[in-house]
Amino acid sequence: MAAETLGAADCSTSGCHGGAGDKSSQFVTWSQHDVHARSFAALTTSRSARMSEALSITDASVSPRCVVCHAPLATVDPALLGAGVEPSEGVSCVSCHNLPGGWIRGHTRSDWTHADRVSAGMRDLNDLYTRANTCVACHQNIDPEIVGTGHHPALVFEMDGQTQDEPRHWRDPAAGIGAQAWFVGQAVALREVSWALLNGRAEPARSVPVADSLSWLLDRSGLDFKEQPFGEAGNGPDALASTVEKADLLAKRAARSWDPSFAPTALRRLSSTGADFIPGASPHLVQASRADRLVLALDRLLSAMPAPSRPAGASQSLDRLFHLAQSQPDFDPAAFAKELSRFSGALGVSVSAGP
């Protein structure tokens, strides 16, 4: 008989994850501070009602198109739900850590290692490739018709920054954050948008610039990735299939083997891409999309530096780059290139001294 699917309340006893202190307060952190605990509530707002009307959805709170991400327990066979478990709890424990199995009874035991938990069936979220695959499904992959209503934003998956913003219910404050998490996330994001285009699951006008900007970003960062052309000649099935494969392999490799010296190297290389933003070097929309991804990358790579090593003036210049990148559709590539040069100059020897 299949194990019952547990709700968050089943994990909230004081002897498990509902106690006090850093080691057992995970339920309190999730329920009081984490937006995932309120994901179902988003389906009951007036904004959701307008979106539902545009999509001819009678009730977003039970529509498979909505609950798959906002209330994953609604997708579980009701016969398998434990007593009192309701989809309204949103994105809860089992949504990320895996459905109940052999790992449930022993995962809080002090004599169990992380490897023991994983071998028993708990999802290995310490592995950045596994984590990226878990998160990207709802933090990037979204029905283009939903975005087309004008009431739901197009999502940008950036694993490092989004993990940093997450209220921490894990013990190691530095686990799974930094340049490695950023890079793995971007490679997975490229794989997913390319797969969606290949399989007709994305709206090309929105998604081709995203795929191009991610491919460009990974290529310019310098970690052994050959830029895959996206455009009239390179956006066909063969090119997309190749990108899906390459990006997936790149994400796996970066998750399993990482040289810390890559972060300053990538920061230096990406800050030196001003020539790509000379007016006319690429179509205007392409440059705007690349700028949007670039400033996010510079932010994460700069944040990965020890605070005392961050050059004075770099943060202020980065703020100006964010402002310029967010000026679509009035993006000014010349102004962006000029400010990018200032940012590169502010980095100076602190970064150029890297390998």
Question: Which residues fall in each region the model found?
Answer:
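General N-terminal leader/first-domain-start detector
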Residues: M1-S25, T44
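Cys/His-coordinated zinc-binding microdomains
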Residues: S12-A20, H70, H97, H139
